[in-house]
Amino acid sequence: MITPILRRQLLRSARQTRCFSSAPIAAAQEIKRLGVIGAGQMGLGIALVAAQKVGVPVTLVDTNQASINKGLKFADKLLAKDVSKERITQEQSDKIRSLLAPTTSMDSLADVDFVIEAVPEIPSLKFSIFESLAQICPPHAILATNTSSISITRIAATTTKDPTDTSTSSRVISTHFMNPVPIQKGVEIITGLQTSQETVDTAIAFCKAMGKIPSQSADSPGFLANRILMPYINEAIICLETGVGSRDDIDAIMKNGTNVPMGPLQLADFIGIDTCLAIMKVLYEETGDSKYRPSVLLRKMVDAGWLGKKSGKGFYDY
């Protein structure tokens, strides 16, 4: 039976689905300054693509100066590669680089129109950040998260002490970019119960202006991409730990048999072993379904500090 509540949810879902084709790109022009929290691979990628494609100044925040330095070095490397391949000129590269304004202070986000959080997948960390953003950012700013598995409704709830006051929580949304951001076109748009249609429209328009192709997912554990992808990676790890196949054979059969650019174990290294574990934990804890239980080897690798490409060692050595 379709209850009144379910009917409203279905109608809202239909409206949000339609907006993907109707949202005007011009809305992105209202974003005069972007904020990005986290200078890691994801955050830096988002900041760089926004500066290059949309041409907006980007305040890049990370409390760790070493992370900022590493991120900017990576940005310089990517821009230099684009120049060498004649995708952009040196003048364009310099312009893009000048749009990135790194800082260790969250208070620097006081003048942004749109902020995207891209820190590690730790619920308490994200909740704390959004609680701060509610106090720092202007009242019109869109507060987006790049979370790959945590409930948007829960994140939005941290922005207010009064659940009936949705003036801030209505501006919270997920723009889950795919890694690596400069290459992958996909982005998941996930709304919480509080998210307004205006927030959805603005987020979609801005993502399109970045050259991305948005897809919508319900606010469900893992959303779409990781609900499908992570069990695939986890099962590959189980096959390795139980001796069903070697590392090379597992990756080879999936790469050559399904026409994907890399096998599941190499992909796990690229994503980050710790990130894979964090997402599997959320899926398992939120659903209670044993098919999402993280493999023993996955847990052990995180304990060992073998986090994949970013640590120099994972299923492969880098």
Stretches found by the model and what they are:
Residues 59, 212, 229-233:
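Structural/interface elements that position substrates and couple domains in central-metabolism enzymes
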Residues 142-218, 226:
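Rossmann-fold dinucleotide-binding core
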Residues 42, 175-178, 184, 254, ...:
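Methionine-biased hydrophobic packing positions in alpha-helices, especially
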Residues 2-32, 37, 54-55, 197-201, ...:
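NAD(P)-dependent Rossmann-like dehydrogenase/reductase catalytic/cofactor-binding core
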Residues 63-70, 80-143, 150-151:
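Rossmann-like NAD(P)-binding element
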Residues 2, 12-81, 85, 136:
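NAD(P)+-binding Rossmann beta1-loop-alpha1 motif at the extreme N-terminus of oxidoreductases
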Residues 59, 101, 116, 173-175, ...:
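Hydrophobic/aromatic beta-strand patches that form the interior of the parallel beta-sheet core
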